[in-house]
Regions:
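C-terminal peripheral helix-coil segments that are non-catalytic and often amphipathic
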Residues: 87-94, 123-139, 154-196
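Amphipathic, non-transmembrane alpha-helical scaffold segments
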Residues: 56, 60, 103, 115-126, ...
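Short, basic, alpha-helical segments at the C-terminal edge of helix-turn-helix-like DNA-binding modules
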Residues: 61-66
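N-terminal intrinsically disordered/low-complexity leader segments
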Residues: 1-8, 168, 196
């Protein structure tokens, strides 16, 4: 019972921390607000995470853990790319804290471990897209004279960025708008990579 209660408290603290850090960043976040929102005292917060920076790191890791993407190794490159872009959009739309906390990971006072966790997540996402592009080159679907790395980085950045206008364009959360943006991005990349 004690372990379950402890886990539930820790999870409440992390959920409150994600909201606070996503809203205010590391420098503007206040541990008293996090503790109040989680229904615990500040001492318990420090008991679990050691410091505000430790709590920030744990919150970033929790957000990134939920934002895992899985690239399919089967199918046509264009369809695999479409699926992966959709996954990137979905994890971003499903975790409003993701983009703000990723951006905050490069600010002053953030631990190297937090910045490294974000860099590793981003590198895995780029690697997944790059692999699809390389597979497309090997199978003859895409030109072999292209460097897949910068294209992959552009695809990941654009995929993550398409969620922001979709949120502001339609109040419902706008999966229709995200679908249109995803399809346009994939079409642009496939057209650029195609043999001419």
């Amino acid at each position: 019972m004690g372990g379950e209660h402890s886990t539930a408290r820790r999870d409440r603290i992390l959920a409150a921390a994600e909201r606070e850090f996503a809203t205010h960043g590391l420098s503007g976040a206040r541990v008293d607000r996090i503790a109040a929102r989680a229904g615990v005292n500040k001492q318990l917060l420090f008991h679990y995470f050691g410091s505000k920076a430790g709590l920030h790191h744990a919150a970033i890791v929790a957000v990134l853990d939920r934002a895992q993407i899985r690239a399919s190794a089967h199918g046509q490159p264009a369809e695999r790319l479409r699926q992966l872009v959709g996954e990137l959009q979905d994890v971003t739309a499903g975790s409003p804290a993701l983009l703000t906390m990723m951006a905050d990971a490069n600010s002053a006072g953030v631990t190297d471990n937090s910045a490294r966790a974000v860099d590793e997540w981003y590198a895995r996402a780029i690697g997944s897209v790059r692999q699809i592009l390389v597979d497309g080159q090997r199978s003859g679907h895409f030109r072999d004279d292209l460097d897949a790395a910068p294209i992959a980085e552009l695809v990941v950045s654009a995929s993550l960025g398409t969620v922001v206008p979709a949120r502001s364009a339609e109040p419902s959360g706008s999966s229709k708008s995200r679908d249109q943006l995803r399809d346009t991005l994939v079409r642009l990349v496939v057209d650029y990579c195609a043999w001419r």
